[in-house]
Amino acid sequence: MKIINIGVLAHVDAGKTTLTESLLYNSGAITELGSVDKGTTRTDNTLLERQRGITIQTGITSFQWENTKVNIIDTPGHMDFLAEVYRSLSVLDGAILLISAKDGVQAQTRILFHALRKMGIPTIFFINKIDQNGIDLSTVYQDIKEKLSAEIVIKQKVELYPNMCVTNFTESEQWDTVIEGNDDLLEKYMSGKSLEALELEQEESIRFHNCSLFPVYHGSAKNNIGIDNLIEVITNKFYSSTHRGPSELCGNVFKIEYTKKRQRLAYIRLYSGVLHLRDSVRVSEKEKIKVTEMYTSINGELCKIDRAYSGEIVILQNEFLKLNSVLGDTKLLPQRKRIENPHPLLQITVEPSKPEQREMLLDALLEISDSDPLLRYYVDSTTHEIILSFLGKVQMEVISALLQEKYHVEIELKEPTVIYMERPLKNAEYTIHIEVPPNPFWASIGLSVSPLPLGSGMQYESSVSLGYLNQSFQNAVMEGIRYGCEQGLYGWNVTECKICFKYGLYYSPVSTPADFRMLAPIVLEQVLKKAGTELLEPYLSFKIYAPQEYLSRAYNDAPKYCANIVDTQLKNNEVILSGEIPARCIQEYRSDLTFFTNGRSVCLTELKGYHVTTGEPVCQPRRPNSRIDKVRYMFNKIT
C-alpha cells in the first residue's frame, strides 16, 4: 500500500481543521462530521485549542482511499508555534496551504508558505470558503501571485452564479505557466507544433515536486464542495519520500506527547525498513530500545499494530526517546529533514499562585519542556525562582493556559527579559595546579582565552599532547569548558572567543577524567575574571511586507524600537523593508505594525547575531552545581 504524509496549513480561521474533518468523512474514515464550534473534531482536541480556535500542537489522523493511506498532519498556525510547524513539516511528503476566498492571503499564510519553500515541500493551494457571499476569485488569484508565487496553475473553472459549479480544466488554458517555464516547450509552442498532454503533465509534475509550480484548487470544506476531487489530487499528485525495496530501518522522532494518564508517547516517521513489535532498535547510533507497544492512526483512530512499513507514522510508548532521535541508520534520513530549532531569546520568572503547588509546577514544566525544545527552565540557586526561556508572547500565554487546563496549576509571571551573551574583553591565562589548595581535584589545568570578532562563536583547541594526556582526559576538559561557558561572569553564555587548553598534569593512578571535568569550569571562571567580559545582546534581521501607504509610518517608528532599516523595495503596491533590530524590541514593533496596518503586514525575522550592549550590565543568577560550587567559592575568595 502507498503511504503518504501531508500537512494542512493555514492562517487562523481559514478552515484547516474543518477541511481535515471533511477529508475523513468523504473518504469513509468517519461516519459523522466533527464540529470546531462543538469541540468534536479529531484534531484541535484540547480545550485551549478549541477556545482560541487555533491549532497549537501537531495533530495526526488518517484515511484510506483505494490503495493509498494518507496521514494528515494538522499543523499549528501561529507565529509563536513555528518550531512545532517546522518539526511537523520535516515529516511531510506534501502540503495543502489553505487560503480563505473571503480573506485572501493573510500575514500568517505568507509566513507558512515561506516555511514550506524553505523546507522544499511540494504544495497545493486550496481556496476554501468559495460559497461565501461577495467572493471575487480573480482578486484572490492576483493576491496569490503578488504575495506568494506567480508560478501557479489554476486547475479548475469555478462558476459562482447562478448555481455553484467547480469543474476541472481539460483544455490548454491551464498550461500557459507550465509552457512558459520550460524553454523547450515554449520553443515548440511558438513554432506552432502541437504539445502532447503527457509531456505537459510530466513537466508540471517535475516542477510541482521541485517546488517551482503550485496548482490551485477550490472548494468549501464546511459544505463539502470540491472535497472528493481534492482527495483524488492528494492521492495522485503526492508521493512518499521513502526508500523503496528492502533496506535498513530509519525513522525520526518529531513529536513527544504526554497523555492525561502521564504516559509518554514518541511520534516517529519511518523513512525506510520495517519496524516490528518486540524489535530491539538502535537509537542515534548509541543505545538500543525495545519496542513493547506500537500504535498508528487508522481511519482517524489510534490502533495497536505489530509491524509498520516505510512511510508510516508510528507512536511508541517510551521514556527515553527524545525529539529528533533517529532510529536505525542515520545515513538514510533525508537531508532536508534536518533542521535547526530557533533559539529562545526571552526569559521570564514564574511562580505558582499557590506556594504549595511548586512541586506540581516543576513536574509539569518537566513534561512540557520535554515535548517542546523551545521551552527551557531552571531553578535559581540563590532565590529559588523558576526561570523559563521561550520565544514569544503567545507561546507564554498558551503555556500558562496549558498549566491551568491540564495540570491544574495557576501561575504568576514577572516581566520578561532578553537572553544575553558574554564575550571576553582581552587575552588572559590562568592555571590551577594539582595539590595546591584550595584545589581538591587530582588534576592541573591551564587555560588561555582571547576575544574573537562577532559571529565567530566559541572556538576550542588543545595544545596538550595526546601522547602525554590521553583522549579521555582531553575530552573531559573540553566537556568541562563547554559546561563552564554556559555561565559567564554575569551568568550568561560565553561566546565569540577562543579557549585554549595549554597545560595539564595528572597523577597516575589516582587522577580520573571526572577530576578534569569538574576543575575545567572553575579554571575557566578564573581566566574570565582576569580577562573581564562584556555583554552582547541578540539582534534579528527582519523583512517587513506592508501596504505601500504605510511606508512613512514604518520608517518613522523604526528609531523608537531601535530598528535600523537598510533596504527598501516597492513591489505590487507593497513596500518591503529590510533591516535589523534588537530582539528585546521585536515584540512591540511587530505588534505596532500589525495594529496600524490592520493585520495586513508581515514581519519575518531570523537571528542575525549579537551586538555589544551599552549601559549597566544585566546580571543573571548562576545555576547551582553541588559538586563544584564550594570549590568555586573558595577560589573566588582568594582571587
From Swiss-Prot:
Residues 1-242 form the tr-type G domain. GTP binds at residues 10-17, 74-78, 128-131. It comes from the Bacteria. Keywords: Antibiotic resistance, GTP-binding, Nucleotide-binding, Protein biosynthesis. Signal peptide: none annotated. SMART domains: EFG_IV. GO terms for biological process: response to antibiotic; ribosome disassembly; translation. One of its GO terms (molecular function) is GTPase activity. CDD domains: Tet_C (cd03711), Tet_II (cd03690), Tet_III (cd16258), Tet_like_IV (cd01684), TetM_like (cd04168). Belongs to the TRAFAC class translation factor GTPase superfamily. Classic translation factor GTPase family. TetM/TetO subfamily. Abolishes the inhibitory effect of tetracyclin on protein synthesis by a non-covalent modification of the ribosomes. This is Tetracycline resistance protein TetM. The lineage of its organism: Bacteria, Bacillati, Mycoplasmatota, Mycoplasmoidales, Mycoplasmoidaceae.
